[in-house]
Amino acid sequence: MISKILCLSLLVAAVVADQVDVKDCANNEIKKVMVDGCHGSDPCIIHRGKPFTLEALFDANQNTKTAKIEIKASLDGLEIDVPGIDTNACHFMKCPLVKGQQYDIKYTWNVPKIAPKSENVVVTVKLIGDNGVLACAIATHGKIRD
């Protein structure tokens, strides 16, 4: 019975957070990006007023004591900084980072209820270290809905 529950839990976890297709906008440091409820190159639906979880596996390209998260969204061609995010990446992964080592960051934030609906959302996420960009990914298949 316990093994059946464990198998079901693993299956649900695999369905909820699947790897998504992203474009690397740095030097191929990003190894994998997973977003709750999003799969491959299918459009990723972001719901206003709901939490949104992003997890990324990347290789550090530098030694750094600190790391900052920068998230920008392009809504129908208009680029904005995503409001209300905690920009200290060290709150979501262990710092300092060592060049050449692989790290996992899991970040959750609430999408503002006032976010405009859009069927054409491009999200750019950058991790910035003491010496510049650590990793960068662009997701091009987003939609914002209720």
Curated annotation (Swiss-Prot):
InterPro entries xref list: Ig_E-set (IPR014756), ML_dom (IPR003172), NPC2-like (IPR039670)
GO molecular function: sterol binding
Compartment annotation: Secreted
Pfam families, per database record: E1_DerP2_DerF2 (PF02221)
Signal peptide: 1-17
Disulfide bonds listed in the record: C25-C136, C38-C44, C90-C95
Biological processes annotated in GO: sterol transport
GO cellular component: extracellular region
Alphabetic keyword roster: Allergen, Disulfide bond, Secreted, Signal
Note: The sequence shown here is from clone 2. The N-terminal sequence (AA 1-8) from clone 1 and 11 are not yet known.
Similarity comment: Belongs to the NPC2 family.
Protein name: Mite group 2 allergen Der f 2
